[in-house]
Amino acid sequence: MFRVGSWLYGKKPAANASTQSLDSLVELRDLEDAMRAATLILNDDVDGAEAGLAEGTSAFHNLGRGVVAFIRATLGFEQDIMRQASERLNEAETSASVDQHRAQHNSYAPNTYHSPMYLPGTEFALCQAIAQLMSAIVGVLNESLTESIKAFYRLRKAYITLDAILKMEQKYMEESRAATLVESTTSGSVPSSLRHSSSNLHSSSSSISSAKGKEAAADTLAAPSNDTDVQERLADLSLSGEPAVAEDPGQTPTPINTDILDHDPDSDIFQNQIDVFVHSGSNFCFGVLLLLISMVPPSFSKLLSIIGFHGDKERGLKMLWQASKFHNLIGGIAAFAILGYYNGFVRYCDIMPDSIPGKDGDVQGYPQKRLELLLAKMRERFPKSQLWLLEESRMSGANKNLDRALELLCGEERSPLKQVEALRVFERSLNAMYLHKYELCADSFLECVDLNSWSRSLYYYIAGSCHLSLYRDVKETDSAKAAKHAELAEKYFRMAPTVAGKKRFMARQLPFDVFVARKFAKWEARAKEWKVSLVDAVGVDPIEEMIFFWNGHSRMTDEQLQESLQKLAWSESSANTTWSREGPEEKAILKLLRAAVHRSLRKHTQAKEMLEDILGQDRTLFKGHLKDDWICPVAHFEMAANLWMERPTYIATHGGAKQDSNKESARPASVNDALQYEREKVRKCKEYLEKAAKWESYELDARIGLKVTAAMEAVQKWESTHPTL
């Protein structure tokens, strides 16, 4: 058998390897060679990865080529790379299907590997599931609605395969526990010969499982049951047939097998690299699947009916953490997914479940120490990769150290992967924006235009907004500089709508493309009506608006937040000669942005007062041609976020609110009072969230919907742990 370390470094097989058949050794060698080569992309060595994978033609090599293209596609969202990824993944799926049928057909042959845990051909079924899952993600990112719909059917097929593999693991663990129980109950009261026989029961579990698996394949065809057999599920995944359908659209996934998730890579049950591949791969894929589905915003909820199952964020995260333990390609990709989720999504959302201390911390909070250890491990494994440096920068920003985050991305070293370089520059652009470093921000976003074609209208828009801020800063003190910045601002503002709508997501225009085009049209109409220049027709600081939409406030220190308030104050200053002409819409935007900053400053009373003023107005004031119809639903979410942060449990973890008055300053006197106080806060929070979730279609609803979905899940989790008597 092989230890886990042989996965990447090709250690010599153990002495007993000679007893294995040639075919099983060839399969193992193909797996190790393919995964070793594909792993090079996580160290920014795409040429080495492609060259290594080109040396083989096995299903594992085909999958490796697909994975390499998938990583590049999801990093850059470029159509040509996504097409290449789709083609490679389809080839990998077909190749794995052929090998799966071959393995099942030859399952009785002595020259095949017989896993103690998995049925014959499971490794190739997993290859299909990985290809289907990655192909589905690429399909969703595709501009074609047809491809996007097909993607959801691929998710169904991948789900059924992965669920079947998990059932095999569950069955194996149950048999192992039963064998151990028999051994422990008989060892003290039976003859030594029988004790010896009992002790062999556990060690012979491989043959027992193998035999049962073979019997199940025949039994299922003869007598199908409501709980479709694992073998039948795997057989149903033939590419020539119709998409597999779950028995019940609302079925409950296989319960998570906590026992096997407690096993580290050096456990005795992971002695063969094929089993390691299946276990780590199935946990990674199923974990990603459950996590992604749990994050779907309300506006896309109808698509879930195509899939027929629901996400489970907590379970998905546990499975991803398990996959990240393994020193292979899967472990590296799982680590990247984990870090991206916590430093990206969690820090983007404002209402998340409370942290619960435990053995490994709480997967749904922000396990900072655990994340730091994981990142350090990846930096050690892949020292040449800018990808992990990027993750370190994101982690610094997520923990309110934006200066360090920006510094890490301003080095001289560049990644040979264009997609990683584009991500680095984009993150640098955002950090510069949060820090109000306008010239660096503008230059960086203009650099993004050349590196990535995903949302060029947004890049031009933010570059123009930066020069607008610089124009406003010097308008009254340096007319020459002001004129220069005004010219550049207008130039980039006018370029933005010309490239909007070039990209599609599930056949829909990108949310920010729609936003940018409308904003420009609104300003142009105002400039004509007011007879002023375009830059003087712009309302509330668009950079502060962008900081809000990217949730930059959660990454900023109090000092940086105060700077945002100063920038917002310009609108009502004497320098703004058009403020008296503004209607309730622009004034509501100013109040909303100020409320968001005050919430981040933990001044909830002031924040709620501003929001109440917005919500007290007629909602029709914010609807109509060229208007910002997102104001009211976002104000509802902001109110919910304030209420969530006022709870005693939240305060115990993050500190108390900083109120400027004694209003609402009294704290509950007893534990019972505290629970009632918190329950009331959660109840009100939920009311605002439900209104936001049920709001009619509005601009940026998909983006805001991500936060609303996460928030509703957090509230439901709180309610499940605090049931009413």
UniProtKB/Swiss-Prot annotation:
Residue span of region Disordered: 187-209
Subcellular location: Cytoplasm; Nucleus
Pfam families, A to Z: Iml2-TPR_39 (PF10300)
Record keywords: Cytoplasm, Nucleus, Phosphoprotein
Cellular component per GO, a single term: cytosol
Transmembrane segments: none
UniProt main location, coarse: cytoplasm
Family: Belongs to the IML2 family.
Function recorded in the entry: Inclusion body (IB) resident protein that interacts strongly with lipid droplet (LD) proteins. Involved in LD-mediated IB clearing after protein folding stress, probably by enabling access to the IBs of an LD-stored soluble sterol derivative that acts as a chaperone in inclusion clearing.
Record text on subunit structure and interactions: Interacts with lipid droplet proteins.
Protein name: Inclusion body clearance protein iml2
